Amino acid sequence: MPRLLPALWLAVAALVLSGCGGYATTSDTFRRSLTQGKPDSALVAVNKAMEVPRAEDLPKSKTDTPLLLLERATILQAMGRHDLSSRDFEAADKQLEVLDFTSDTAGDLGKYLYSDDAQVYRAPPYEKLLVNTLNEVNYLVRGDLSGAKVEARRYLVNREYFANKEADERGLVALGSYLAGFAFEVDGDAQAAMRHYGDAYEEGGVPGLEGVVQRLAARTGAQDERLKPLLEALPTLPDDDAQQGELLVVVQVGMAPYRKPERLPIGAAVVYASQPGPGARLTPDQQNQANIFAAKGLLKWVNYPRLVRANRFDPPPTTLELNDAIPVAVPEALNVEVRVEEAFKRIEGGLIAAAVVRLITRAIAGEVTQAAARKASGSGGVGLLLGLIAEGTLTALDTPDTRSWVTLPARFDVYRARVPAGTHRVRVRTAGVTREATAQVAPGGWAVVNISDVR
């Protein structure tokens, strides 16, 4: 029996060293590369994570495939490869399951014995909605109104689904509705455009929406009951209005918050996971079990995903210079950073509750194994070590679910103007970096410019 002890101690040590960093580690390289303005390097890193050699290749099915497709689609968009970006967004959208903490119990959340990230990725509602929003941008930049309108309809279906689920996504969805309105407006369907603009207004609005709907109403007579406060006085259109066109510039700035592993003392975790709030919470029996094991010294820490800001400071305002004119501020249309933080706050208690439940499961496994081994071997030392191995196996393989869409921007800024037909030079300055693009606008036509590689 003494000869067995060193081998068992080695097994325990191996388990301690065998834990992995989870998605926070996997995503760190491409997240940092995009933050540094190196989307090419980010693409190499995300392809490596997907185990594919090129952006043209789709990965084999695995638990993180939908999320990695979202990451690559965002990176490809930053590189201006909008066709492949659309393909990845659509492939991810078909596979993406939506997170619903409203009906889960802590036991359901903890049923994956080894790790939260052992299950297929399930996205929070804001991620599902932003898939359609970003893909609308892809189609509009390419001049594909048919594709943009299809994406707008998908967006509408998802928006109505979450409205029926009473998901608190007001304000997040205004930008998607605004882009849908733009697509239908420039395609000549003024009444459908006005309905989408009405949705955007009802959901909190987008800067410049008032002027957009007033011009559309003056030009076409289209109306929406919800927009009446904005349509009481309509502008007089210039004589050459029909010869002008629409220019839309969408700028993505900064990086959204991401999750990283955090250790929380068991006492604080039990208190936090037991307080009333949305989502799963510990039952009185689970609280009692956790406190008993903590008193025995078997439970000390809980691993859970903490949300951290990617940007130490808020990204500075964006300015735009059109055809060498005086630079103007580009208004913020959507603050993703704030929305991510609000959504995470709603589920944080449930995440901690799930971590505590798994911790209890590990402690029970360790005690049962230790007792059985002590009885079979007559050695308390062997029983202790086997108990440590049983608990250690689950501990080493348990990584908090740090998965989230880390390449999302912190903010969307949107500029829109009625411009003469012709070629227009757009110079955007954000976060100390300048990007230039040209836009060709035909008489009565339109163009969309997207700047998304400065994070």
Residue ranges and their predicted role:
Residues 54-62, 96-107, 161-169, 201-230:
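Boundary/linker segments of alpha-helical solenoid repeat arrays
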Residues 86-97, 153-157, 185-208:
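TPR/TPR-like (Sel1-like) alpha-helical repeat modules
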